[in-house]
Amino acid sequence: MPRKFNFGAGPATMPESVLLEVQEELLDWKGLGLSVMEISHRSPEFIEIAKQAESDFRDLLSISEDFAVLFTHGGATMQNAMVPLNLAKSDGLASYVNSGHWAKRSIKEAERYTNVRIAASSEDDNFTYFPEQSSWSLDEESSYVHYTPNETIGGLCLRTLDSSPLPIVADYSSGILSEPIDIEKFSLIYGGAQKNIGPSGLGFVIVKKELLGSPQPITPNLLNYTLIHEGESMSNTPPTFAWYVAGKVFKWLKSIGGVKAIAEINYRKAKKLYDFIDNSDFYSNQINPKNRSIMNVPFLLLNENLNNVFLEESSEAGLLALKGHRSVGGMRASIYNGLPEEGVDALLNFMEAFENKYSNV
């Protein structure tokens, strides 16, 4: 059966060449007579996988030795607790930018462990724009300022960043490796792997080493960045298979030219979709053009009564998971690194045919 195109927000499409390589190695990894899922995380073989994955990740993002790279359990949701537990005081203060659903989730969790100040918010306009950095009101007493560069549900992003008087913390779950970023502007970047890195269940943290060492006393050992760093991300048994696949994805990305190369593809994919939507009277996108995400493209049908028909017929055409989040409705095409450009082309062909078929309904 030919593979279909997955436009879901995550777990996302994996590069097919990576899946085939994993399939080939699944029963016998490097002649051991065992699957990589069966070998000890303490074995020399897995230590090699882990070290190579970190090395390739560092190469792709030009991460200096001033930063620790951690691979963790729990994805980004657990990081919503880990960040304040490790960087803020229980009676201290942290600043957060409220840009949408995931920013609000981060804020709600952080409020359990420190005092939160909202530095900026676009909730007054239903999150149709991203608060520009120049509008952020930062309290100098804050331990850090946190923002979510790409909001998957709303389909908006902030793609440029200047330096800040406060340490900058960013949830890069859905934007990591999609385009070049200047790591040196950040103090901590975290995210879940299931968009652009690999299977779900794995998280990543890139944190300045100078910030390690002062967690809140209540911080569980498994959520303590310092202990995770000292234990080389193996304080307990890590999600070994997801880590192994992540290493394969890093190798794949390097083989096609790295982050700059995939960014050109991503810009092209997104431009095709937005150009088509903007030139249509049948579809629309509500996000301020300068804040549009290159990873998640939400769109509405002029006739909402056709939503279910669109989903049924697109699924029959091999275009899966296009339903928008329940909080915003409509449709959403998530076009992460692993989704080939021909997937976007197939979606555009379907959207055009659907419009021609139902424009008079």
Predicted features and spans:
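PLP-dependent enzyme catalytic core of the Aspartate aminotransferase-like
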Residues: 1-4, 316, 329-361
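N-terminal "arm"/small-domain region of PLP-dependent enzymes with the aminotransferase-like
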Residues: 1-40
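Conserved N-terminal alpha-helix of the aminotransferase class I/II PLP-enzyme fold
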Residues: 31-79, 86, 101, 109
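Conserved PLP-anchoring active-site segment centered on the Schiff-base-forming lysine
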Residues: 88-104
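Active-site phosphate-binding strand-loop segment of PLP-dependent enzymes
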Residues: 110, 121-176
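Active-site C-terminal subdomain of aminotransferase-like
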Residues: 193-274, 288, 358-361
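Conserved PLP-binding catalytic core of the aspartate aminotransferase-like
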Residues: 283-314
